[in-house]
C-alpha cells in the first residue's frame, strides 16, 4: 500500500469483437504463457457455442453466468490471541469479478470434455443455470462465511 496517494488501476483495452472490458479481462485470465490470440479464439468459440445453446446474446449469457459465480462474502484468516479465526468479510466489486472469472476458468480446465472451448462453453452454460463446479465453489465460500458469522466482529 502506498503512503502518499492511492494508485489508479490500469486501464484495460476492451476486447476487439464485443468491445467489453469485462470480456477482455476474462481473456487475460484464461491466457497462458502470453498467448492472447489463442485465448481469444477459445473464448469467442465458447461464446458462440453458448449463444447457440441459450438463444441469448453471447455477451448477455456470459454476464449472466458470471453473475451466478461472483461471491459476495469470503473468509479471511485473522489471528487473535494465539488462535486463528476465519472472519467473514465482504468482497470488493473488482475482486468479485476476478474471483468469479478465476473460478470459471479453473472449473473449465478440470472438466473432461474434448477442447478447451467446449469445456469453457459447458462451464459457462452450467453457471448460467446455477449449477456446475464454479457455482459450487461460490456456495462453499458462502457456506464458510455463514458458518463463521460469529467471528464477524473481528473484522478490520
UniProtKB/Swiss-Prot annotation:
GO CC terms in record: small ribosomal subunit
PROSITE patterns for the chain: RIBOSOMAL_S7
Gene3D superfamilies membership: Ribosomal protein S7 domain
Pfam family, one: Ribosomal_S7
Source organism, top-level taxon: Bacteria
Keyword Thylakoid: no
Subunit structure: Part of the 30S ribosomal subunit. Contacts proteins S9 and S11.
Protein name: Small ribosomal subunit protein uS7
Organism: Pasteurella multocida (strain Pm70)
Gene (UniProt): rpsG
